[in-house]
Amino acid sequence: MSVFEPKSLLEQMQNAEYIFGIALRHTLSAVNGIYVTPGPFSLYRRSVLDELGGFRHAHQAEDMEMALRIQRAGYEIENAPRARVYTKVPRTVPSLIKQRTRWTTGFLRNVLTDYRDLVGNPKYGVLGLLVLPLGFVSIMGGVALFFVALYETGTQLVKLYLLSSGVPLSYTLMPRFSFELFYIPVTFIAVISLVVTVISIGFILVGRSVSNTSASLTLSIIGYTFLYVLIAPFWLIRSITDVVTGTRRAWR
């Protein structure tokens, strides 16, 4: 699944994210760990849908709920990475946050209510022991990393300013500021962020290869690298808050 004619940097960011998703689903399909069958161009066996009772309302994440129900019933979900299907994506940050809040709350509510028996259950293999638990870890970890990064960034900026405003060898008592590479802090958060970024870009390039995508991804990777980390925490925090408080939002 690819973004239809991405133009703005925000759309390019989502294009990289969707190609990342291609690589992720390709990997998960090898171990029967797919937990969502995307709405666009997912194909189902009629007999399986009849057996399982068809689609039903599922916290505005019906495609995810159906995939989890299929997995619970013991069936396998396959992935065709080169199947070509396009989707239009949100063009503004507020609409993107609203969409991703719906997706994230759908995951949390489905897994925490109807399908919590799958989590940590060896009967469901990689899906139960790794994929679903890591889904929780990535959501909670993303929020925690965001707040820790804010704190460390603020602390380091203050230290950097104080260091660069020192008076030795200066003939003025007025504060001065200059950018010095020597003062750039190498923190645990910085290292983790760099590792995650490199792995993400690697997955994007793998997704491009397995899906046979020929278009240049330079702008998409730039958008993904610099925009995603700024926007994603907002829908993660909003999603957790909605689940905890029981808030229900409209589809649009």
Where are these predicted regions, by residue range?
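Hydrophobic side chains within well-formed alpha-helices
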Residues: 9, 66, 93-96
